[in-house]
Every structure is written in C-alpha cells, then in structure tokens.
Amino acid sequence: MTKSNIKGKLSFKSVSEQSAEMKILKNLQSRKIPDNELLENLGMFLSSKNLSRILCLDFLYKLQIKINGNIFDFGTRWGQNASLFSTLRGIYEPFNRHKRVFAFDTFSGFNKINKKDGKSRLMKVGNLKTSQDYPKFLQNHLDLIDSLNPISHIKKIWSIKEMHLKF
C-alpha cells in the first residue's frame, strides 16, 4: 500500500482504492434514488471497510450495555462515532434515560505536536480540524439523531467544544 494524496488530503489508501471511493461518492451525488428514500438506502454506498467499522462499534456498544455510566467520545472530529453510539443506544437501550453520549473535541485540529507523536505526515499543527461552524452543526445534527430515538424529550447527547485534558 502506498501513501498518496488526492486534492491535498492525507490518505494511506492505495490510488486505486481512492479512485474507487471517489466513483462511489460520485454515484451517491448523482444518485437516481429519490431524496425521501436515500437514508433507507445508504447501505448501497458502504464499503466493506466502512461497514466493518460500524459493526465494530456495535460490538463495543454491546460490551458495555450492562455497565452503568455514560459514553465519552474524545476527539470526535466529525461526530460519526457519537452519532452511531446514540443510534445504538436507541436500538439496544431505548428507554435507558441515564445512558448519555458526550462528544468532545477542540474542532481546531492539533494545536501542537510533541516529539512522542512521531513523524507521520498526519502529525502537523492544525491537521484534523473541522470547518469553522462545525461544532454548532454537529450539535444540531446529534439532536436530530436523538430525536428519532424513544423518549426523545430527554436530551441524551452532547457535543462539547474546547477539550483541555492533561495526562
């Protein structure tokens, strides 16, 4: 596998894999599926890697069902894990009003790099930042996802900006 860049984005995927993913993205963007049926058919656009990742999160969620407490997603970036955990909570613990999901991130990328981080091309100041208004978008989106779960009148998911943790 070679390290490669498409449009300046860091990727460790092969060129052929990136090309196939771009074609799938174009298929999604130019789909013949009506808007009102798109969400029910998103599986059409999932690769085995993406589905494996979702199934892994499903496995991890099932491991903690009998454990009291909340779910914390540190470094949430785009919020996919938090969104999936909220959805899984709605599936496996629909009436557990005490299980909450917290998504933490600075949303500004790496503010500094330590030599312990290594010399990967990923390790650059500002890398992994989101768009400027993303934290607000993410919270609104997570609220929408949660609104589709049972007992949606009780807030069960939060996106928290400016995570300052020292280890």
Residue ranges, per PLM feature:
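N-terminal auxiliary segments of SAM/dcSAM-dependent transferases
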Residues: 1-23
